[in-house]
């Protein structure tokens, strides 16, 4: 990747991360970059959103179960 392309990619990720924070998605920069890359490779964004939501539900349930134990 040349310098200009790398700079453009970085700026795009910065913008996406700012929007993500504004929308209070709770996604960190690394996770967001993975999700963007998956979308760029043809993965359905709605399916990814559903997976993220399900993983969050499962993690919350696991934490709740651990707190009760």
Swiss-Prot record:
Signal peptide coordinates: none
Keywords: Cytoplasm, Cytoskeleton
Statement: the UniProt record of this protein carries the keyword Cytoplasm: yes
Any one Gene Ontology cellular component term annotated for this protein: gamma-tubulin ring complex
Disulfide bonds: none
One GO BP: mitotic spindle assembly
Domain of life per record: Eukaryota
A Pfam cross-reference name: MOZART1
Subcellular location: Cytoplasm, Cytoskeleton, Microtubule organizing center; Cytoplasm, Cytoskeleton, Spindle
Family in the record: Belongs to the MOZART1 family.
Assembly and oligomerization: Part of the gamma-tubulin complex.
UniProt cross-references to PANTHER family, sorted A to Z: MITOTIC-SPINDLE ORGANIZING PROTEIN 1
Biological role stated in the UniProt entry: Required for gamma-tubulin complex recruitment to the microtubule organizing centers (MTOCs).
Protein name per UniProt: Mitotic-spindle organizing protein 1
Source organism: Picea sitchensis (Sitka spruce)
Lineage: Eukaryota, Viridiplantae, Streptophyta, Embryophyta, Tracheophyta
């Amino acid at each position: 990747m040349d310098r200009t392309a790398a700079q453009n990619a970085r700026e795009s990720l910065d913008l996406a991360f700012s929007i993500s924070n504004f929308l209070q998605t709770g996604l960190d920069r690394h996770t967001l970059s993975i999700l963007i890359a998956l979308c760029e490779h043809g993965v359905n964004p709605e399916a990814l959103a559903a997976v993220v939501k399900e993983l969050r539900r499962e993690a919350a349930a696991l934490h709740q179960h651990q707190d009760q134990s």
